[in-house]
A protein has these predicted regions:
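N-terminal exported-region signature
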Residues: 19-73, 174-367, 375-438, 443-453, ...
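Short, surface-exposed loop/turn motifs with a glycine/proline- and acidic-biased composition
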Residues: 534, 553-589
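Glycan-association/targeting regions that enable binding to alpha-glucans and other polysaccharides
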Residues: 71-184
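Conserved structural position at the C-terminal beta-strand
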Residues: 156, 490, 585-587
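Surface-exposed, proline-anchored Ser/Thr-rich loop/turn motifs
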Residues: 188, 194, 274-276, 281-285, ...
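Terminal processing/anchoring signals of secreted or surface-associated proteins
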Residues: 41, 245, 324, 457, ...
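Residue-level detector of functionally pivotal "anchor" positions at catalytic/ligand-binding pockets or at interdomain
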Residues: 72-81, 345-347, 489-517, 532
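Short, compositionally biased serine/threonine- and acidic-rich segments at solvent-exposed termini, linkers
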Residues: 63-72, 466-506
Length: 600
């Protein structure tokens, strides 16, 4: 419209000048010429230049303001003033008509519609034709109207080669005939979901029927939705866009979800809101998409690869029909990006001191790749948003977790520390269901390592050190129902060697129960004991008749040196009488008894 207004103004002005019998001689308009001196009459024009009429001539000279304005008008690209694109498209054999109003003083050389289908970087160019004055139209063929949806923009070029383009426009597409199906080539589950295996799923697009019929596994299948506020699983009643669900069935054939009628959403950034804690989400797009998130949101992980169960490492894209678990330290969000432009891909460059190590465990039937340790510039050595707790999942037969306090609280799958330190020790615990034999521990680098950084894996149970853990991994012969303890030592070579050896030196060589002290005692005495590895341990008090008097401890306990007290009370809290008592320590492979004397 600006260009139209300018040309109208120029036309009116020229008409006025001709009406007053002024003669425009453009040969007198050199670029940059100053105004005439002497007895000339100067007329300020409305565009910012001036007219000057010399007394010796009937002609009018126009100042350079007029020329520059006219030059600017003709050098501007075409104006796309109207671009009509349907907000809702019904899939049909007729295609979709798109039109735009394009104007330029130089005339329009060409107008084209650039169509970009979801999941593709290239743009398909469709010529537009001028059906009436300045109105250009074209038809988007039915073959481009796919469940992936598309977006489009108009490009116009004038006769001087100047080009302009509109913004992208996109709409919703309504589909019928089961076109929105899990068997689509872009689906994470193109062959469906096999029986008796938990999987995470979500729905791309919006099904016309959002209801989920309530069912349990005994009836054939079951859905579960995770509620991060209550930390519980509930049976959902409806499908929610951007939400992931646990699904399991026991039907004979693989299950493939189809939707009779559904709608593809517009190809615009889609925000998935997150609550504090673990969230299970999905993508509403019918093709793989990237995403962006802030530092308080952890990595996205998913469950199951092909026919093997387990948890993945960090995922960089969200695929249709799949579900993803993600931890958020507070109320936050993830933005799904159907088209990742170059200016969106910029991220913070890690400092040279930062590093990240993915620790993986895998057995014949299960895997777990989600544990990560490392250092970040803004992380703290205490608990912060970079430290992610282990999730409450429906199925987790194998895991390796970390402890943030070097005690017995092994509840984290992510432990990042400050780059202010170079050397450090990470405590790890391997948990596995009985039957998960021949477990393989390996690592993968999620980043470049700082120069001079070394690692070792200290095996507490076998009292061994693997200095080549990054290259070779480590095989575990798992034949116990107990958790196994390990340590990752990182830092300079000297620190890693000395610290790894010192860790082994501080591990007791054997089970041991000390004599109580004081002995005789009244009414309290102390017992020290040592465990060479993590063990189920009992320490019981008996009288001379062999009757059990008190259970001092009966639990799984970490390796190392420990102490416990007996206060002279029985199991009911009553004082026992003077006499001889026995303290017996028992593990799966060890028993030792100490005689004690209570004197009042």
């Amino acid at each position: 419209m600006r260009k139209k207004n300018i040309i109208i103004t120029l036309t009116i002005l020229i008409s006025i000048l001709f009406a007053q019998e002024f003669k425009l001689q453009f040969s007198f308009i050199p670029t940059g010429q100053g105004f005439a001196n002497g007895d000339s009459n100067k007329v300020l024009n409305s565009i910012g230049g001036s007219f000057s009429q010399e007394s010796s001539s009937d002609s009018i000279k126009v100042g350079d303001g007029f020329l520059k304005s006219s030059q600017n008008v003709f050098s501007e690209p075409p104006e796309i003033s109207i671009y009509n694109f349907p907000s809702i498209i019904n899939k049909s054999s007729e295609g979709v008509q798109v039109e735009a109003e394009v104007f330029d003083l130089n005339g329009i050389k060409s107008a084209n519609l650039h169509v970009q289908v979801g999941g593709h970087n290239n743009e398909i160019i469709i010529p537009m034709t001028e059906n009436q004055n300045n109105i250009f139209q074209t038809i988007i063929h039915d073959t481009l109207i796919d469940i992936a949806n598309f977006r489009a923009r108009v490009f116009a070029e004038d006769n001087l080669g100047f080009i302009s383009n509109s913004l992208f426009k996109t709409g919703s597409i309504n589909f019928k005939n089961n076109e929105m199906t899990m068997s689509h080539k872009n689906s994470y589950y193109p062959s469906g979901i096999q029986k008796n295996s938990w999987r995470l799923i979500s729905w791309p697009g919006i099904p016309s029927n959002l209801s989920l019929a309530e069912s349990n596994l005994n009836e054939g299948h079951v859905f579960y939705k995770y509620d991060p506020l209550s930390n519980e699983y509930i049976i959902p009643k409806s499908i929610e866009l951007g939400t992931g669900y646990w699904f399991k069935h026991n039907y004979k054939e693989a299950v493939i979800f189809d939707e009779d009628t559904s709608t593809s959403i517009p190809l615009e950034n889609y925000v998935v809101n997150l609550k504090p804690g673990w969230n299970i989400i999905g993508s509403p797009f019918s093709f793989p998409v990237s995403f962006k998130k802030d530092s308080t949101v952890g990595s996205l992980i998913t469950f199951g690869i092909a026919n093997k169960n387990g948890w993945s490492a960090a995922q960089n894209i969200l695929e249709p029909w799949n579900g993803y678990a993600v931890f958020s330290a507070n109320n936050s969000s993830i933005t799904l990006i159907p088209f990742y432009d170059d200016n969106q891909s910029r991220s913070r460059t890690p400092s040279l001191e930062e590093w990240s190590l993915n620790i993986k465990v895998e057995s014949e039937s299960f895997f777990n790749y989600m544990t990560v340790i490392g250092r970040k510039e803004f992380a703290k050595n205490l608990t912060d948003t970079y430290d992610i707790p282990s999730p409450k999942f429906l199925e987790n037969k194998l895991s390796i977790v970390t402890s943030l306090d070097s005690k017995n609280s092994y509840h984290y799958i992510s432990d990042f520390r400050s780059t202010a330190d170079f050397n450090g020790v990470w405590d790890l615990r391997l948990n596995a269901e009985l039957g998960q034999k021949n477990i393989f521990i390996s690592t993968s680098e999620n980043s470049f390592f700082p120069e001079g950084l070394y690692f070792s894996l200290v095996d507490i149970q076998n009292k061994s050190i693997n200095y080549e853990i990054i290259k070779t991994g480590s095989v575990v012969k798992y034949n116990s129902d107990l958790s196994l303890d390990y340590k990752i030592v990182s830092g300079d070579k000297n620190y890693v060697t000395i610290t790894s050896e010192k860790i082994l030196e501080n591990i007791p060589d054997k089970y041991f129960l000390s004599q109580n002290y004081p002995n005789p005692f009244n009414p309290k005495t102390k017992l020290d004991y040592e465990l060479p590895k993590r063990s189920n341990i009992q320490i019981l008090i008996y009288n001379v008749l062999g009757q059990q008097v008190k259970i001092l401890i009966n639990k799984e306990q970490n390796y190392g040196s420990h102490s416990i007290f007996w206060d002279g009370l029985d199991q009911l809290g009553n004082e026992v009488s003077t006499g001889v008592y026995f303290a017996r320590m028992t593990t799966s492979s060890f028993t030792q008894t100490k005689k004690m004397l209570l004197l009042k």
